[in-house]
Amino acid sequence: MTITAAMVKELRELTGAGVMACKKALVETDGDQEAAIEILRKKGEATAVKKSGRIAAEGVVFTAVKDGKAAIVEVNSETDFVAKNEKFQTFVSNVANQILDSDAADMDAFMAEPWALDTTKTVKDELVSQIAVIGENMNIRRFKKIESDGVLASYIHAGGKLVY
């Protein structure tokens, strides 16, 4: 089967993977998009394992407040360049919003929860996917959730940049 640019573009939009990685996956699967997605997912897991030994000391703190609940989360990356990246920021925002609806008592329980935006994945699976797309080691370092009948508000100094 001939792999067209449109097929590569569609797979790239679905996965966020690079052009050549998408093309290779489509060639390997003879144009089967679902099989190509699975190959890219497995490749992303391998990439995440390789990157997991690298230090992720940069990152951001993000808060979410809704219906008497507030969550704060710290997500780390290797560089401040990635910490400022729109995809990274969106991921961190989604993590904070998921924490609002989570009953997880600790990080292990949270990482095992279904990802709210795609329940076929866990939070850990989505983190691995983001590592593959962004290309740096990342980790959800810590989070805290509070509930109150009073007023909850949020303020993050310095745009959420980590300062030690």
Summary of predicted features, one role per range:
Residues 2-164:
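N-terminal assembly/interaction segments in proteins that build large macromolecular machines
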